[in-house]
C-alpha cells in the first residue's frame, strides 16, 4: 500500500494535548453558535459543527489504549479513570442540579437525585451531562475493545463489523422505541467515535504509517458532513437522516485531527502549544462547567445567545475550572497513590 511519506499515527500522540485544547474551544464556540442568530454562526455550524466532540472521544479512546498497554491492571485502570471523571462531575452536577432543579425550578430533592444520577437524561432527555454518561459507559466496555484491537490483526475488519453492529442498533432503537431513542440519541451516535479512537490507539502505540485509505475515508466523510450540514443550516434542506451528519462528522474529525497535527508540527510554536495545552488540560472540567453555566444563565434572565453574556460566562467557567482542576489533580493523586511498602 502507498504510504503518506513517512507520516505515522504517532503524530496524533505528540499533539494530543494541543488537539484536546482545540476540541474544547471549538465545542464552546459551537454551543454559542447554536443559540446565536448571526449568519456567521450558521456557517460555523456547517463548516465546523460539533466536530470537537468526536475529536475528544477519539483522543480519549486513543489515550486509554496507551494507558492499558503500559499498565494492564484493571483495578488501577478503573481507579484512576473513575476518580478522574467522578470527582469533577460530582462537584459540578451537584451544584448544577441543586441550583437549577431545587432552587430555580422547584422540582425538589428527588428530581435533584435523578439529575445527578442520569435518570433525567435517560427518561426525559435532559442532556446537560450526556457526555459524562457516555464516558462512564465506554469505560465499562473499554477492556473488551482493548483486547479486540490489541493484536493488530484484522483490526480494520473488526472495526467495520463492530461499527456496523452499533449503527444497526441505532436504527433498531430509533424504530422500536423512538421516544427513548430521542432522549439518548446524542449519546448513542457518538459511540463510533470512541471505538475508532481505540482502533487508532493501537496504530499510534505501534507507530504505524498513515496510509492512503485513511485520507480517502476521512475526506469522503468530511465532505459528506459539510455538504449535509450546509444544506440543513444554510439552505434549509433536511438530510434523509441526521445520522448522516453525526457519522460524517466523526470521519471529518479524523481528517481535521491529522491535518491539525501536521500543521502544528510544521509551525512548531511553543506559545500556541502552551495555549492549546492550557485548555486541553482542563477540557473535561471546562465542558461540564460551561454547559452548566450556559443552562442556568438562561433561566435567570441572561440568555447565552448574547455574545457579551456568553463571553463573561466562558471567562467565569475558565476561572472555576482552574480551581477545580487543581483540586481534581490533588484528589486524584491522593486517591490513586499506591501505599508505600514498610521496610521490614
Feature map (PLM): residue ranges:
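Membrane-cytosol interface segments of multi-pass membrane proteins
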Residues: 1-168, 270-272, 279-282, 302-344
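C-terminal ends of transmembrane alpha-helices
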Residues: 29-37, 166-180, 224-237, 292-294
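Membrane-interface helix caps and helix-loop-helix hairpins in membrane proteins
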Residues: 38-44, 121-129, 173-185, 234-244, ...
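Juxtamembrane membrane-interface segments at transmembrane alpha-helix termini
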Residues: 55-56, 170-176, 206-209, 227-231, ...
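Transmembrane alpha-helix boundary/anchor motif
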Residues: 59, 140, 195, 199, ...
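Short glycine/serine- and small hydrophobic-enriched flexible loop segments
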Residues: 62-66, 146, 198, 202, ...
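Loop-centered beta-sheet repeat module
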Residues: 158-203
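Alpha-helical transmembrane segments and terminal signal-anchor/GPI-anchor hydrophobic tails
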Residues: 184-193, 202-285, 289-297, 303-313
